[in-house]
Every structure is written in structure tokens, then in C-alpha cells.
């Protein structure tokens, strides 16, 4: 068979961009997007709008290898741009709307963004960010007159070169979207925590996102024409690839700007929502809401990832009609690559035991290749006893190409044919993975990554602070919150209060990253070599 080689007919680069074209053909008259009281699109209309925007981008000089950024809530336009930008040949960069202007400017500079789409609600943030740049991107305003009348007025429209609606008007709906030259060509760059001092831009290719999208649909057993509620921010790792996945199965995207429990319950009931995805905090909010007095009319599949939801929250959510699935993924893997695959015989167990099993992250998804937990010193697999802790390592098609402009960071993550996550875990006797800690010192608060190292760097800029260490403190609502342990410099005429330290951090960095708790110690505990013992501080934080 040596004479059989790849040809032009069987080696077309894998890309998910064709999902939209197919959806327009198969599900053309079906609803693609619902938003607010008046916005409804079909898949035929969504395809038309995306092609027009892609065409308009091309006409103003955006093309291959250019980075196009988006700063937006979960609106129809935000959904469309997940297709439109790569259809123009450009690389998509979604930006966290919770960041401050300084950090946004750092990201735009680092990825050399050529154009920035801005949701009107974040126009002031964007304008402030570009004033810090020597070569600012072109600004495109996503305006919504109906919502603007509600109070979010755009004060500096002159800074914006185009309106999103104008791009649709001027674009060509017959535009031939640009297929990647190689399936290894970049399609997205997403930033993890740690963006201020050393931005970590995670670059994914068409091939990896294609595989992850189909794997996510398969693992969660998403049927055709689901109704998907967007409680997960699309800026968060491209919504774990579900913008493209929902197009593949012809589903309905129920877009929502803000997470508000009563409105979420109304959307579930009004639109017959079947699937939703979010951080454990979303489950907590929905479980604690007064709207939860009445069980759901029909079951809703809820996928969560990151820190384990508390057992009490799991039990409460499932009693309301949510079918909760739990998994594990990273920005570097583009989505969930470990899920708690449910075994039928577990249904016979008491509810508390089922909740305990669901709190584990699980086993590799069907489309992912290999997962292991290894001893950091020897590199050998740890015992599968549920107790021996090691570092989680991965091999699979959806793992990133690498970190943008960071060869050392990329090299340190890829070793001996594996991707080293920096997360610590155990393997149970049945082969299921459970995360125990995060050696990268990342705190997951409300579904967002907070780098303890970055918070510590800000604390050390306070003239009263002598030593600082930040750890995760368990929180029933947020999952985890940053907890700072601080020792003050001797001889201070006035010692700052914990509230003053917190306010200082909020002024210096995005508010969600600031410590929620500050504890003053005479001296932070250290090893014989002078290293702060964070494990001890974590135990103290747990008992606070």
C-alpha cells in the first residue's frame, strides 16, 4: 500500500468553518439565535450575516495572520464573530470583559491586534485602553439602540471607524470564506490569567478546534437541534467551542447579557432550554434563587468544569431538574478533555454517594488520546490508589500549538511528548481522575482564573507590605476566592486595615482579582530555605 498517498481530494485541511454553511442548508428555517424580546435569527440569516461581516473585514484589509479582537458580552454579534473573523482568514481573539483598561491594552499590544469589535456597553473601557497604545487597532462599535436607551450610552462615537451594522450592509453575502492553507494554521488566541506582567496567549489551530468541537458534542451526547443557553461567557476559551458545536447540530443559541437568576429561569421556561454550561458558581446562584421554589418543567443538562461543585449544591440542583455533568479542561486544551462518565450501576447508590462521585473530574473524553498523573521527580505514573498525588499530563489533538511569543513557556510545558498542566491530581482505583491542587497557583473564582503570583506582585507594591502570599480560600458561592496573608514593615506610624489593603488592590488591578480576605501575620511561615509555606497558609484559609 506504499503507493497510496494523500491527494487534494482526501487531504483538505480540517476546519469547523463549514459547520455554518451546512447549518444554513440543513436547518435554514430553524431558529439559530434568540436574544431579548425582539431579536430572532434563523440559520440562513446567521450565515448571511457572518459572510457579510467576513467580506467587509476582507475589504478593509483584514486577512490571513491578522489578529481581530472582540470585547463583548454574550450577544448575537459576539456569537457571529466566532465565525466571521476566521472566515475572513484572520485569527480570533476574545477578550475578558472583566479586565481593566490597562490589562486590555497589554493584550491588544501583545497579540498585535489590527481591529477591535466593541460591545457598546464596554466602549469606555475600549477607548481608555487604546489611548495607551502607539498603534491602536481599528475600532468597530457593536451598537444596540434598544439597549442604549436603557442607560449605557456611547460617549465617544468618534473614536469608532465603523458600526457593526454597517459592515453587514456593505458586505457581500456571496463571499467565499477563506479556507485555511493548513489545518495547523492558527484560528484563535486566548489569554489565560497572568496577563499583566507576562501575557500567556494560547494559540490553537483549525485542526485542534475542529477535533475538540466534535469531541465536546459526542462526550456530552448533544442531540440535533438542542436549545443552548449562553450562561458561559463566550470570551472564556471561545465558550469551550460550543459556538461552533451548536451550529454543527442546528441548535438554538439563547444569548443573554447578564447572569441574573430570575431571568435565567424565565429563559429556560420560555424557550425550552435543554443544555447550558457554566462555572460551579452558576449552579450555586440558580440553586439559591427564589425562582428555584418550583422544579423545572423538563430536565436541563448542565455541564460544569473547574473546581468541584459542593455536594450540597449538586444535590439541590439535581432536585430542581438539572442533570449535572462535571469535567476538566484548560484554555490550553480548548475545552473539556476529562469528564465524569457516569456508570449505570451508580444510579443505585445513595444521593450523597452519587454527588461524591460526580465531584471527581473523571476519565478522558472519547476524542482525546492520553491522560496520566506522574511523579514530578521520576516522571513515572503514580499508583492508582486515589491518594498518591502527581502532576496531570496530557496528549491529544486539541492541545494548543503553544504560547504566543513565549518560547520558554511553551518549551517548559511540552516535555517528553507530554503537555504538563501544572495541576496536581490522583487516579482512583477505577481509573477516574480527581484534581487535588493547582501547582501553578491559579485560583478559580467564579469560573475565572486568578493568578496568585500576580496578586502578590500588586501587594508588594504597597509601601506598608513586607511579605505577601495569596492562596485560595474555599467559598460556597464563588468556589474559591483570593485570600492574602500579609506581614507589615516594622516601624509604621500607622498600620493599614484589611479593607484598605483590599481597596488598594482593586485600584491596581481588575476588581475580581483582588483579595476578598486579608489576614495579618507577624511573619509568614517559611521553610529552612526561606520559601513561604503556602500549604500551611491554605489550611489556615480553609478554617477561617
Curated annotation (Swiss-Prot):
KW Transmembrane (keyword) present: no
One GO process term, biological-process aspect: fatty acid metabolic process
A Pfam entry, by short name: AMP-binding_C
Tree of life domain: Eukaryota
UniProtKB keywords: Fatty acid metabolism, Ligase, Lipid metabolism
Enzyme class (EC, first level): ligase
Classification via InterPro entries: AMP-bd_C, AMP-bd_C_sf, AMP-binding_CS, AMP-dep_synth/lig_dom, ANL_N_sf
EC number annotated for this UniProt entry: 6.2.1.-
Reported tissue expression: Expressed at low levels in roots, leaves, stems, flowers and developing seeds.
Annotated GO MF terms: ligase activity
Functional summary from the UniProt entry: May act as an acid--thiol ligase that activates carboxylic acids by forming acyl-CoAs.
Family statement: Belongs to the ATP-dependent AMP-binding enzyme family.
Protein name: Probable acyl-activating enzyme 8
Lineage, highest ranks first: Eukaryota, Viridiplantae, Streptophyta, Embryophyta, Tracheophyta
Gene symbol of the encoding locus: AAE8
Amino acid at each position: 500500500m506504499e503507493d497510496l498517498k494523500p491527494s487534494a481530494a482526501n487531504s483538505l485541511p480540517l476546519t469547523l468553518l463549514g459547520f455554518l454553511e451546512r447549518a444554513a442548508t440543513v436547518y435554514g428555517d430553524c431558529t439559530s439565535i434568540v436574544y431579548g424580546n425582539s431579536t430572532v435569527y434563523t440559520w440562513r440569516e446567521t450565515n448571511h450575516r457572518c459572510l457579510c461581516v467576513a467580506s467587509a473585514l476582507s475589504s478593509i484589509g483584514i486577512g490571513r495572520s491578522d489578529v481581530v479582537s472582540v470585547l463583548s458580552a454574550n450577544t448575537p454579534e459576539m456569537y457571529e464573530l466566532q465565525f466571521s473573523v476566521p472566515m475572513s482568514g484572520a485569527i480570533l481573539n476574545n477578550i475578558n470583559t472583566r479586565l481593566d483598561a490597562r490589562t486590555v491594552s497589554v493584550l491588544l499590544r501583545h497579540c498585535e491586534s489590527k481591529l477591535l469589535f466593541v460591545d457598546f456597553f464596554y466602549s469606555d473601557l475600549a477607548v481608555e485602553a487604546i489611548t495607551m497604545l502607539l498603534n491602536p487597532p481599528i475600532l468597530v462599535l457593536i451598537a444596540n439602540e434598544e439597549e442604549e436607551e436603557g442607560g449605557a450610552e456611547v460617549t465617544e462615537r468618534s473614536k469608532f471607524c465603523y458600526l457593526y451594522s454597517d459592515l453587514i450592509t456593505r458586505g457581500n453575502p456571496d463571499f467565499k470564506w477563506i479556507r485555511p492553507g493548513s489545518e495547523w494554521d492558527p484560528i484563535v488566541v486566548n489569554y489565560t490569567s497572568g496577563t499583566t506582567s507576562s501575557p500567556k496567549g494560547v494559540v490553537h489551530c483549525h485542526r485542534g478546534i475542529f477535533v475538540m468541537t466534535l469531541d465536546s458534542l459526542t462526550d456530552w451526547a448533544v442531540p440535533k437541534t438542542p436549545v443552548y443557553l449562553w450562561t458561559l461567557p463566550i470570551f472564556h476559551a471561545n465558550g469551550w467551542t460550543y459556538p461552533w458545536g451548536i451550529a454543527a447540530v442546528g441548535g438554538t443559541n439563547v444569548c443573554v447579557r447578564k447572569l441574573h437568576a430570575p431571568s435565567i429561569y424565565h429563559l429556560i421556561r420560555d424557550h425550552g432550554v435543554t443544555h447550558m454550561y457554566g462555572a460551579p458558581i452558576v449552579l450555586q446562584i440558580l440553586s439559591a434563587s427564589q425562582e428555584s421554589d418550583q422544579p423545572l418543567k423538563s430536565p436541563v443538562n448542565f455541564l460544569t468544569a473547574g473546581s468541584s461543585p459542593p455536594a450540597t449544591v449538586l444535590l439541590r440542583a439535581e432536585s430542581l431538574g438539572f442533570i449535572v455533568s462535571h469535567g476538566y479542561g484548560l484554555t490550553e486544551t480548548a475545552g473539556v478533555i476529562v469528564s465524569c462518565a457516569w456508570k449505570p450501576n451508580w444510579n443505585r447508590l445513595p444521593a450523597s454517594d452519587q454527588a461524591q462521585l460526580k465531584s471527581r473530574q473523571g476519565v478522558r473524553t472519547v476524542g482525546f488520546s492520553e491522560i496520566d498523573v506522574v511523579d514530578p521527580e521520576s516522571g513515572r505514573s503514580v499508583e492508582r490508589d486515589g491518594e498518591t498525588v502527581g502532576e496531570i499530563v496530557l496528549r491529544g489533538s486539541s492541545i494548543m500549538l503553544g504560547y504566543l511569543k513565549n518560547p520558554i513557556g511553551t518549551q517548559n510545558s511540552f516535555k517528553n511528548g507530554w503537555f504538563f498542566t501544572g495541576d496536581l491530581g490522583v487516579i482512583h482505583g477505577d481509573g477516574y481522575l480527581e484534581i487535588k491542587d493547582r501547582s501553578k497557583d491559579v485560583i478559580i473564582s467564579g469560573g475565572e482564573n486568578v493568578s496568585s503570583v500576580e496578586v502578590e506582585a500588586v501587594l508588594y507594591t504597597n509601601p506598608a507590605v513586607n511579605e505577601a502570599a495569596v492562596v485560595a480560600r474555599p467559598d460556597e458561592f464563588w468556589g474559591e476566592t483570593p485570600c492574602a496573608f500579609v506581614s507589615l514593615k516594622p516601624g509604621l506610624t500607622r498600620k493599614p486595615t484589611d479593607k484598605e489593603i483590599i481597596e488598594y488592590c482593586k485600584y491596581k488591578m481588575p476588581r475580581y482579582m483582588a483579595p476578598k480576605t486579608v489576614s495579618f501575620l507577624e511573619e509568614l511561615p517559611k521553610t529552612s530555605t526561606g520559601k513561604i509555606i503556602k500549604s500551611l497558609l491554605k489550611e489556615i484559609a480553609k478554617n477561617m
